[in-house]
Amino acid sequence: RFKKIRRLGALPGLTSKRPRSGSDLKNPLRSGKRSQYRIRLEEKQKLRFHYGLTERQLLRYVHIARKAKGSTGQVLLQLLEMRLDNILFRLGMASTIPGARQLVNHRHILVNGRIVDIPSYRCKPRDIITTKDKQRSKALIQNFIASAPREELPNHLTIDSFQYKGLVNQIIDSKWIGLKIN
């Protein structure tokens, strides 16, 4: 993971750890002139590694975004941000997106009262995301919420940390996406 971070820059969804030498990110010595192909490839890899997607999944999202009205790049980022694993990460219920994927796969998460075990589930506005009533599920989420530093919550989400409940208010606004993409 650190190799990817050193090569592509900060990827907050991939890991909460940081490489030791802060000035070593994006080493300027080996850079040279970057071709258009290299720039596009690096941006695509940033998306893949940040959101934990395979090549095929990313191509499918690009295909959907191209069919939709509006800017393809903005629609693509909205689609990726409305995934269940990413919303859990944004709510602070998981420290990383892979951690959120594991919570979903292990059936700790309910959406609108139903167990959802698909991390790529596309959340809609007014979806209520809660944990199972099992003690183990609540303990996992409680540990994440307690240990995570309090970051500003995006305005399209609200969280009730005492009831372990999150609410999707609306589709995400582009300024809340923490990833810098060209």
Swiss-Prot record:
The Gene Ontology biological process annotation of the record reads: ribosomal small subunit biogenesis; translation
Where, subcellularly, is it found?
Plastid, Chloroplast
Q: Which Gene3D superfamilies match?
A: Ribosomal Protein S4 Delta 41, Chain A, domain 1 (1.10.1050.10), RNA-binding S4 domain (3.10.290.10)
| Pfam family of the protein (one) | Ribosomal_S4
Q: Where is this region: Disordered?
A: 13-32
Q: In its keyword annotation, does this UniProt entry include Glycoprotein?
A: no
Main location per UniProt? plastid
Which segments constitute the S4 RNA-binding domain?
Answer: 82-143
Q: Which UniProt keywords apply?
A: Chloroplast, Plastid, Ribonucleoprotein, Ribosomal protein, RNA-binding, rRNA-binding
Q: What InterPro entries does its record include?
A: Ribosomal_uS4, Ribosomal_uS4_bac-type, Ribosomal_uS4_CS, Ribosomal_uS4_N, S4_RNA-bd, S4_RNA-bd_sf
GO MF terms here are: rRNA binding; structural constituent of ribosome
One GO location term (cellular component): chloroplast
Q: Can you tell me which family this protein belongs to?
A: Belongs to the universal ribosomal protein uS4 family.
Say what the protein does. One of the primary rRNA binding proteins, it binds directly to 16S rRNA where it nucleates assembly of the body of the 30S subunit. With S5 and S12 plays an important role in translational accuracy.
The UniProt entry, under PANTHER family, shows:
30S 40S RIBOSOMAL PROTEIN, SMALL RIBOSOMAL SUBUNIT PROTEIN US4M
Record's subunit section: Part of the 30S ribosomal subunit. Contacts protein S5. The interaction surface between S4 and S5 is involved in control of translational fidelity.
Q: What is this protein called?
A: Small ribosomal subunit protein uS4c
